[in-house]
Amino acid sequence: MIRAFFVTDLHGSISRYEKLFAAIRDEKPSVLFLGGDLLAHRLRPVLWGTGVITNFVSEYLQVRLKALRDLLKEAYPAIYVIMGNDDARSEETYFIDTDRQGLWSYIHEREVEYGGYTIYGYAYVPPTPFQIKDWERYDVSRYVDPGAIPPTEGFRTVESSDDVSQATIARDLDRLVRPGSLKHAVFLFHSPPYQTSLDRAALDGVTFDGVPLDVHVGSIAIKRFIEERQPYLTMHGHIHESSRIT
């Protein structure tokens, strides 16, 4: 039996990461999935030891993961990682560098094999009210919920190579996943599926220009994909309060 940990939305919290590393040392999972929104906010300094961290991946995560690998040796888990909508894509080069060092596998829009399963990673979320758009896509069409900012607006830390006015989560999933059975497929998403217990936001009674906001903010495309293709397992992050509300 594969012993797995799934953790998401740590947002650069040193205390939460240290709890995670302690749990890995104690319980020795075979595999760890990190579901995005892993970095500290760009404008918030992170203190560690006696100094301030200026690059969270290279100065903290790589250091702690190397120490963990040295300690656990053969018991060091396989680690699969995606970024999230609050992670600046300008930091992606450091995620790739950590992959090259063998500390984790960065799997956004990739498929990898592990223990008889095919693992897929996908970081994009539907449009949000937030300004950073590195990891946002139109969902199934160019419709945007009231109060949300389209992916064509806001700002990006890295120029997109896609036509963001036409790209959708639905098209991405069609391209990423080949036809056929997904009974041994595992998906690491940042976005939750729409209208489920995982995408319930604390928006009760909130309006925008007099229009009540939908309390469900997940992806229609991801929900349809799960219902139609029936993968073995999907993991999701993004909406912090959903577990408390539901």
What annotation goes with each model-predicted range?
Residues M1-F5, E111-G121, L182-A185, T246:
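Beta-strand-turn-beta hairpins that frame and shape the catalytic cleft
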Residues L39, G49-L61, K183-Q230:
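Active-site-proximal segments of metal-dependent phosphoesterases and phosphodiesterases across multiple
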Residues K66-I79, L103, L176-H184, R224-Y232:
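A structural motif corresponding to the C-terminal end of an alpha-helix
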Residues T8, L39-Y60, P129-P146, T207-D209:
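Acidic/histidine-rich helix-loop elements
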Residues Y117-D214:
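Active-site-proximal loop/helix segment associated with metal-binding centers of metalloenzymes
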Residues I14-Y114:
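Core catalytic region of metal-dependent phosphoesterases/phosphodiesterases
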Residues H11-S15, L39-L43, V81-T93, E113, ...:
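Active-site environment of divalent metal-dependent phosphoester hydrolases
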Residues A4, V31, H184-V186, Y232-L233:
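Short, Asp-centered acidic motifs that coordinate Mg2+ and/or phosphate
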